Amino acid sequence: MYGAGGGRAKPERKGGVKEEAGPGGTGTGGNRVELLVFGYACKLFRDDERALAQEQGQHLIPWMGDPKILIDRYDGRGHLHDLSAYDAEYATWNRDYQLSEEEARVEALCDEERYLALHTDLLEEEARQEEEYKRLSEALAEDGNYSAVGFTYGSDYYDPSEPTEEEEPSKQREKNEAENLEENEEPFIAPLGLSVPSDVELPPTAKMHAIIERTANFVCKQGAQFEIMLKAKQARNSQFDFLRFDHYLNPYYKFIQKAMKEGRYTVLAESKNEEKKKSGPTSDNEEEDDEEDGSYLHPSLFASKKSSRLEELMKPLKVVDPDHPLAALVRKAQADSSAPAPPTADGTPAQPSQVEYTADSTVAAMYYSYYMLPDGTYCLAPPPPGIDVATYYSTLPAGVTVSSSPGVTTTVPPPPGTTPPPPPTTAEPSSGVTSTTTTTSALAPVAIIPPPPDIQPVIDKLAEYVARNGLKFETSVRAKNDQRFEFLQPWHQYNAYYEFKKQFFLQKEGGGSTQAASTAEEAPTETAVEESGEAGEDGAPEGMAETGGRGSGKKEAGSSKSTVDGKLVKASFAPISFAIKAKENDLLPLEKNRVKLDDDSEEDEESRECQESTSSVANPSPAAAPPSVAVEEKKPQLTQEELEAKQAKQKLEDRLAAAAREKLAQASKESKEKQLQAERKRKAALFLQTLKNPLPEAEVGKLEESTFGVEDTGVMPCPLLVGGRTLPILEGKPPERPSNRCRDPPREEEREKKKKKHKKRSRTRSRSPKYHSSSKPRSRSHSKAKHSLPSAYRTVRRSRSRSRSPRRRAHSPERRREERSVPTAYRMSGSPGVSRKRTRSRSPHEKKKKRRSRSRTKAKARSQSTSPSKQAAQRPSAHSAHSASISPVESRGSSQERSRGVSQEKDGQISSAIVSSVQSKITQDLMAKVRAMLAASKNLQTSAS
């Protein structure tokens, strides 16, 4: 739980800068404040449920039982139980001081400005103000002189086909400039209806009046906030100086603004423009006749003066409000006028006259309320904003809505420029009434309601993606429950439009319709499932190949057949079928989700292909049609040879991939085995080196390092066995101490040593009976442990007796340096006694020291008056050299240590002869094995190179 930084103090000063103490000071002055902070690391665990509860405010409780004020348990307001002392009506300054009406109004405005950000998005408001400001600028620029970008077709542009005569264009330009100057500098005369006070100055020119008038009109419509914005934006524009309070035209501006608010003033600029429009046609014709000799400009190239693009776009969509009081009367009159006429003798229903479209303004407006879809279908326009969709389409005029009564066809107006399609019952008079009845009754409940422009691109895009990726994509999107894709639900009002677009894109993705011209055309929506299911199952022949690409999406208009579909009219097109064989690449995307590797079952592959092809074709919605009837799916028909070829190709690719993976796995396995073999060889060589030469730990470490170099070159030093003794190996070993590795003394000397040891043992037993019981069992057990294993395997065994015998003086400071240099991993035994056991042979110099120490121990054993303190003083170097390996047992007494050391020496010399013979045999066997392994490794290296 606690991190590495736990408990770390961070001294800081209040001001953020730590003050350093002076050279003589202690740093704890009165002006210095320290903050001691202890930090501990902690883990944070993700708890989604707790986070969701916090976000929903489930941890909040009502304050004092008031559900309007919710606080958490750490809120300081929990300590307040009564706020009556702080209520505004009792304790505010306004209790004694009553504001006047003007002051209260100003205070209310100030409060509104203070708390504006609480209930208003300031960024959105600023963007709206910018937009309104742009509109004002455009309105100010539309005074007839110029637009945002004006047209100039004068002599400034060189035309090589025209003679270069500049006299007439220059005269015309001067004339136009004079007219503009006259218009702009025309003095302003107040109109008769405008009674301007005598103390208010009038603007000098008509242009200045127009600017003031438009600004006042704009501020009246948008609010006083825009006046402040205009004043700030146009601070450097001299034309808007009248907005300043100290300007002489500001009273006139305020007067015009007040008159507009009261409705006593109409904008003069608009009335002038209306007069110009009325008198425009006659005067324009005369001017055109006069100016034909000049530079003629076609009327379509003129800049539009007062026409708004937004109004043009919205004009065809104007519909009478169905909630209007007069709308009920209009609908009643239309229902009376468009009542079904008695059918004629041949059974065809009576057609409503063309007068119905123009007689009423509502029907005339609805004539244009549609838009055409890419496949020839046209839908009714979306309702105007603020009107419910269901009520709008249910309360449409009778001349436009669908009648479900038998014998009455729909009267949806056709697109402009085309005639209304003929009724479908003219061909067969006997069965016409029944067919029309079934169609209209089946299609009446569902109507394609076009979505508004902000939702329509989303629906179109999703329908296209579903047609391309299959129904699984639609299911996954629906499962997310996103608000933007609610139209995927069957109960949604735009679901019919979505299904229609999906079917349209499916036909487009499938390469177009492949039905014959003689079969009845299917309706594009799910509402005509009964007819389309029956006709589609029989109609499309199976041998028809899929048209390649998407080229057959182009259709030509047919002559007589069309399906009248409520608010959806489908123009009839005769499908053109090209028997072009589909390319291999066009069919490959159907096999995206292919089979697993090494799966050879053809049945599984075929079932997967069928499943993928069905997922890419949309099924009709179950809400609109009975589930037993299914629409025929248009999937591409592949021949048996193509399927077999593709399956064989896929199997071959799968097998190749599996073989490549197996090869890679085998290669990696072989490389790992080679690495393991090399590691084993290195360890075996190192182990044999330690068997042949039981070196001290430092030399073992050096030897291990040198074996890496030996392995790389492939050369292994092979020790020679001469007379059962191992000759020294010179490679990789320091040449300083050769006497430690050779067995120079012959067998006779060893026998003499054994005899001397027996004599010493008898003396120690007789002279020191006190320590007999403690030294004897230890020495015996130790000798047993020694003889139970060869000396080669006793590299890590520690001696129990820690006696400091004089023989340890042979370990010089050089040995200590080697022990320090070797890493701890190689220092398996830290006691010098263990290393002494490994090196059984000693140099003649060491033997002399040994004999002297023996004579000293004999003398000390005879005279027991020697104190331990003197012994410690006599051997300071040995004690200091091996202080790391001395245990607390040594404090028992120097005599006990002496007896243990002597017994250990005797045991070591007795076992030396036996150990040497056993070791030589083991070494011979192991060296034979090593030579065989080295020969094999050399062969491997040569073959690998």
Swiss-Prot record:
Residues 9-21, 169-178, 589-598, 643-679, 733-752, 811-821, 895-908 have a biased composition (Basic and acidic residues). The keyword Chloroplast does not apply. One of its GO terms (biological process) is mRNA 5'-splice site recognition. Residues 632-686 form a coiled coil. It is found in: Nucleus. Plays a role as an alternative splicing regulator. Regulates its own expression at the level of RNA processing. Also regulates the splicing of fibronectin and CD45 genes. May act, at least in part, by interaction with other R/S-containing splicing factors. Represses the splicing of MAPT/Tau exon 10. The modification Phosphoserine is found at S283, S601, S621, S829, S831, S899, S903. SMART domains: DRY_EERY, SWAP. The modification Phosphothreonine is found at T639. GO terms for cellular component: nucleus. It holds the Pfam family Surp. SURP motif repeats lie at residues 211-253, 458-498. Residues 412-426 have a biased composition (Pro residues). The modification N6-acetyllysine is found at K315. It comes from the Eukaryota. Keywords: Acetylation, Coiled coil, mRNA processing, mRNA splicing, Nucleus, Phosphoprotein, Repeat, Repressor, RNA-binding, Transcription, Transcription regulation. The keyword Repeat applies. Residues 335-352, 427-447, 514-527, 615-630, 871-894, 909-920 have a biased composition (Low complexity). Residues 1-28, 156-185, 271-301, 332-355, 403-448, 512-564, 589-680, 712-921 are annotated as: Disordered. Residues 753-787, 795-810, 835-861 have a biased composition (Basic residues). GO terms for molecular function: RNA binding. This is Splicing factor, suppressor of white-apricot homolog. Residues 284-294, 528-540 have a biased composition (Acidic residues).
